[in-house]
Amino acid sequence: MSEMTPREIVSELDQHIIGQADAKRAVAIALRNRWRRMQLQEPLRHEVTPKNILMIGPTGVGKTEIARRLAKLANAPFIKVEATKFTEVGYVGKEVDSIIRDLTDSAMKLVRQQEIAKNRARAEDAAEERILDALLPPAKNQWGEVENHDSHSSTRQAFRKKLREGQLDDKEIEIDVSAGVSMGVEIMAPPGMEEMTNQLQSLFQNLGSDKTKKRKMKIKDALKTLIDDEAAKLINPEELKQKAIDAVEQNGIVFIDEIDKICKKGEYSGADVSREGVQRDLLPLVEGSTVSTKHGMVKTDHILFIASGAFQVARPSDLIPELQGRLPIRVELTALSAADFERILTEPHASLTEQYKALMATEGVNIEFTTEAVKKIAEAAFRVNEKTENIGARRLHTVMERLMDKISFSASDMNGQTVNIDAAYVADALGEVVENEDLSRFIL
């Protein structure tokens, strides 16, 4: 779990997302509150529930990007889902309980990686011994007992030194490795029957889990395989499940995107299985309930839910009142200006201009963007957004692709050249398309 302070979290998000200070502060405080809650004593800790967040703002201003970056910072089970993928229980489609099942699977993977990292040193030592056993099978006497001669030991140490220095990397050996899941059994089941399906699948998987098979491979590949094999042996599956469930219950974060798309439209009186029905099904999850997963029962009382939507057609008040009450923190993200676009092109880590420079450098072409050129690109994107649909920062991708079209096509024939992209180059490449509204609508 992340122990970063809110200031550090915001600083980290600033490296990737321009503006939107309120949204960054809200998610930073929410993430820090997870850590604060874990410092409390048990009777009070159970009573402190997370304050769920609703992010409201036009498309392309950074809502989803904040979620993506937060997932990397959180070091906690995290899942991002689209609200439009779900239907009410009993109808064809995914039900909302699958969010928690997927989150638990994500936690299992995360905890497993942490346990493997923790046991890596022991696994590396064991893997090294298995490689040396394959290279130098221990001598046996006539009764089949292993003899331990000093000469054998010194030879083993010499091989160990060569192995660690990488001198044996390309030598091929034959090793025994776990067969793993040899029976690729995939069972399809109707919605609601996932639990039975998972039990059947684990039964078939366990049938072949203890088998080993011989494989011939290079030592450098064998070492990686054996380290994974040994690390897996050091992990207790039951303990792993319990740790994963605890991680989900105490630190889990669910990001629900496009929540405005499940708002009720007008005075429609029929069954609304993918809109209001989904909202009603989300209520118990957000409020706190127990969900059955293949790893065990998971309580959702302390999972943090962050919902986001553009709310261009619907309004937050169109959500059913019970769900509104369960999303107490509202954050509005502002539309981006031309100055914001200019900063987006240059300031973030791995900005668009840096990406294009790196891509062209692979062909031996050096690209330089002048300050004036960046300003012109930002203005062009902003004007097209104003004239047509406002798709926010995503417009920069279409504008940059149009600008770099000729260079991208001819780069393989321009090895060793330097291309200076200035204001005149930008005006020549984008001028006509930006000025003509019809062309803007269909090309950018």
From Swiss-Prot:
Keyword Kinase: no
GO MF entries: ATP binding; ATP hydrolysis activity; peptidase activity; proteasome-activating activity
Coiled-coil stretches noted in the UniProt entry, renumbered to this chain: none
Pfam families: AAA, AAA_2
Renumbered residue ranges of the record's region Disordered: 143-163
Keyword tags: ATP-binding, Chaperone, Cytoplasm, Nucleotide-binding
SUPFAM superfamilies: P-loop containing nucleoside triphosphate hydrolases
Single Gene Ontology BP annotation: proteolysis involved in protein catabolic process
Gene3D superfamilies (alphabetical): 1.10.8.60, P-loop containing nucleotide triphosphate hydrolases (3.40.50.300)
Predominant place of localization: cytoplasm
GO cellular component, one term: HslUV protease complex
Binding site for ATP: 18, 60-65, 257, 322, 394
Subcellular location: Cytoplasm
Assembly description: A double ring-shaped homohexamer of HslV is capped on each side by a ring-shaped HslU homohexamer. The assembly of the HslU/HslV complex is dependent on binding of ATP.
Role: ATPase subunit of a proteasome-like degradation complex; this subunit has chaperone activity. The binding of ATP and its subsequent hydrolysis by HslU are essential for unfolding of protein substrates subsequently hydrolyzed by HslV. HslU recognizes the N-terminal part of its protein substrates and unfolds these before they are guided to HslV for hydrolysis.
Entry similarity comment: Belongs to the ClpX chaperone family. HslU subfamily.
Protein's name according to its UniProt entry: ATP-dependent protease ATPase subunit HslU
Organism taxonomic ancestry: Bacteria, Pseudomonadati, Pseudomonadota, Gammaproteobacteria, Pasteurellales
Gene it is expressed from: hslU
